[in-house]
Amino acid sequence: MRLNTLSPAEGAKHNAKRLGRGIGSGLGKTSGRGHKGQKARTGGGVRRGFEGGQMPLYRRLPKFGFTSMKSAVTAEVRLNDLAKVEGNIITLDTLKAANVLTKDIRFAKVILAGEVKTAVTIRGLGVTKGAKVAIEAAGGSIEE
């Protein structure tokens, strides 16, 4: 293999649209923009949601609710992720050390997904009812 023999894979490159290159090209004269009008002009076009001056739908409907910022720092932990932690005591810090959670997470809840094989102690984490039953069935415990 030499540099001068390298080429893109078959079908990987497409020919660019060549606009305004005569009638025979199929994209001559108006270059596929039609005749006159706002959309035919350079920089022409209307913003998303614009309805020609009519009050747009997103302004006709009332505002409601908000997005809780707590959701950005909260995570779910699956039961099978608990096996990735060294030792049998599981806290927020041990989950971060095992790369189960990212460093910006401040709240976590263990959910019933997968299975837990070893007896573990959960400290300072939320636990769902199903996950609690599964952890205690494996010989583990939950501490607040």
Swiss-Prot record:
Q: Which organism is it from?
A: Histophilus somni (strain 2336) (Haemophilus somnus)
Function, in words: Binds to the 23S rRNA.
Annotated Gene3D superfamilies:
3.100.10.10
HAMAP family named among the record's database cross-references:
Ribosomal_uL15
Q: Mind telling me which GO cellular component terms the entry cites?
A: cytosolic large ribosomal subunit
Lineage summary = Bacteria, Pseudomonadati, Pseudomonadota, Gammaproteobacteria, Pasteurellales
**Stored NCBIfam families:** rplO_bact
- In Swiss-Prot or TrEMBL terms, this protein is called Large ribosomal subunit protein uL15
Sorted UniProt keywords: Ribonucleoprotein, Ribosomal protein, RNA-binding, rRNA-binding
Q: Which GO terms describe its molecular function?
A: rRNA binding; structural constituent of ribosome
User: Is this entry keyworded Ribonucleoprotein?
Assistant: yes
**Record-linked Pfam families:** Ribosomal_L27A
A GO biological process of this protein is:
translation
